[in-house]
């Protein structure tokens, strides 16, 4: 078999690996790169239409986000994945396509003014909708034949890896003519143990060769936090002051975890004097994904959540829960003075409805803004968690008088101990481990650690090619070792953070422009003139 590493190698986004075996050519994941590149990217070696199958570990955009691009450029083969992943991709890829179209529209308006070349979005909503017809849902733990011909046989099996609803590691059993069967396992993103709702990561049992993620291969999450206790304390103290708890949250995964926690808090009567406090989920994507979480319980829920379902309870439903679908419903939330929880996207506060809720609540000392996920440098969320005293929302300065809090320990990725526990569960050591999906130093560290434990291991570069057969592995091509981004020095880190902030302010400006649609022509002309002057000053 021949492996070509095409993405998320010594990086953490853009997952994609090409496998050629038994006369067939397939892809494992086809994700979108997000954030800054570190290494030169490698394009697909072959035209999209020449691939015969695509196997998908889970729905996150850094693993699935370029699948509509493949379709747009001729791919018509099957996309094998779990049922829950298929369902989530149905909403997430369309949402991604909508963003692509909006960005292309904005860039083309600028191009028309300057005479520059027009661009097309990477893919459209129609592409995202059409590629869903290629998805083939597969159950967990069942071998299925992909190909069976004169050059050999390839079978696939999905194993729950506990990262996201429907996430899986992928085992491929490959029988090439004249050789004994061998199994290669692609770990996908390995989940953190004891996450709410979904099952803990399971091990596939056997691997001759392993492609393994290393996101947190250099750190430990520490003791499991008391999520219910911490969250209950924040709700109680805020409600007692008459304030709201505003939670910026990622629409898929984290929002559902929060609903699970709040249901339990209400069921146990932990909040005194505010027992029926309202909870608003204000994100169309979160609303759709919550419905999918509710429908995919049989294969994906852990024992505790499944027991609730079997007893007639919905783990994501409780009295006082309201889902806001329309803009009018969203606006009405802040017209009610009852202390409440508001969960809204985007998780880093640089777009979406959350910015409206921050505008109405940040200046109120009785309120709390609770962060439940990583906040990237340069984002509004990062500024708030780092103590900003004033921020701008829709062009207006807003004083930060609300309490800023963080619910630590929530992570969908296993730490180094979780990775090691998962690895040691194989029936015997894999003959070779390829380490991917980790920042450069982390992937290198995890590969070195595995070597110290007696494994044969390497962290391949983007574009590297490896040949594996009968337990032996050889590197045929090293790949792209040249870095295009160096951010190790303190000065470089500061520069990078400044650029991130500049970029995010540009995104915010777009939102402000949309917010002013329908305004007086005089005001809009003045606004446009100010932007033009700013562009003329800095376009150099």
Residue spans of the language-model regions?
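His/Asp/Glu-rich metal-coordinating catalytic cores
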Residues: 1-55, 60, 64, 71-257, ...
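Short, surface-exposed connector motifs at secondary-structure boundaries
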Residues: 49-51, 73-76, 237-246, 334-339, ...
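Short, surface-exposed amphipathic charged segments that create phosphate/polyanion-binding patches used
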Residues: 150-158, 292-300, 420-421, 470-481
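Charged, amphipathic alpha-helical linkers/stalks
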Residues: 237, 463-526
């Amino acid at each position: 078999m021949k492996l070509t590493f095409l993405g998320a190698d010594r990086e953490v986004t853009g997952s994609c690996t090409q496998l050629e075996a038994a006369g067939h050519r397939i892809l494992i994941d086809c994700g979108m790169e997000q954030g800054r590149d570190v290494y030169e990217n490698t394009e697909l070696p072959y035209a999209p239409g020449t691939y015969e199958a695509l196997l998908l570990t889970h729905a996150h955009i850094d693993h699935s986000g370029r699948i509509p691009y493949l379709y747009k450029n001729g791919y018509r083969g099957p996309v094998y994945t779990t049922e829950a992943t298929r369902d989530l991709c149905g909403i997430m890829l369309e949402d991604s396509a909508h963003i692509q179209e909006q960005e292309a529209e904005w860039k083309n308006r600028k191009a028309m003014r300057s005479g520059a070349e027009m661009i097309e979005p990477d893919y459209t909503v129609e592409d995202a909708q059409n590629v869903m017809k290629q998805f083939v849902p597969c159950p967990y733990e069942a071998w299925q034949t992909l190909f069976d011909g004169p050059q050999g046989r390839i079978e696939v099996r999905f194993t729950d890896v506990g990262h996201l609803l429907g996430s899986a590691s992928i085992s491929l059993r490959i029988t090439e003519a004249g050789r004994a069967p061998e199994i290669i396992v692609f770990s996908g993103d390995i989940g953190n143990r004891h996450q709410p709702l979904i099952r803990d990561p399971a091990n596939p049992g056997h691997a001759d060769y392993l492609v393994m993620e290393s996101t947190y291969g250099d750190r430990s999450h520490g003791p499991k936090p008391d999520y219910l206790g911490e969250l209950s304390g924040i709700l109680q103290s805020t409600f007692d002051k008459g304030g709201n708890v505003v939670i910026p949250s990622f629409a898929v995964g984290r929002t559902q975890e929060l609903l699970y926690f709040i249901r339990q808090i209400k069921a146990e009567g932990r909040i005194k004097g505010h027992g029926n406090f309202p909870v608003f989920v204000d994100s169309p994507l979160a609303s759709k994904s919550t419905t999918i979480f509710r429908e995919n319980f049989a294969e994906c829920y852990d024992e505790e959540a499944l027991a609730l379902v079997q007893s007639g309870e919905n783990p994501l439903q409780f009295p006082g829960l309201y889902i806001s679908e329309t803009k009018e419903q969203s606006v009405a939330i802040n017209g009610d003075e009852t202390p409440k929880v508001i969960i809204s996207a985007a998780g880093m506060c640089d777009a979406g409805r959350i910015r409206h809720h921050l505008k109405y609540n940040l200046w109120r000392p009785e309120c709390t803004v609770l962060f439940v996920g990583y906040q990237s440098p340069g984002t509004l969320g990062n500024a708030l968690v780092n103590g900003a005293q004033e921020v701008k929302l829709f062009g207006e300065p807003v004083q930060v008088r609300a309490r800023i809090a963080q619910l630590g320990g929530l992570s969908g990725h296993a730490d180094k101990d979780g990775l090691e526990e998962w690895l040691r569960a194989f029936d015997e050591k894999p003959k070779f481990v390829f380490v991917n999906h980790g920042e450069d130093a982390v992937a290198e560290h995890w590969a070195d650690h595995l070597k110290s434990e007696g494994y044969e291991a390497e962290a391949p570069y983007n574009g590297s090619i490896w040949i594996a057969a009968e337990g032996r592995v050889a590197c045929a091509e090293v790949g792209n070792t040249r870095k295009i981004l160096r951010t190790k020095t303190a000065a470089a880190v500061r520069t990078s953070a400044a650029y991130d902030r500049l970029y995010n302010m540009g995104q915010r400006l777009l939102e402000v422009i949309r917010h002013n649609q329908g305004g007086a022509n005089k005001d809009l002309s003045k606004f446009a003139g100010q932007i033009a002057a700013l562009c003329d000053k800095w376009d150099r």
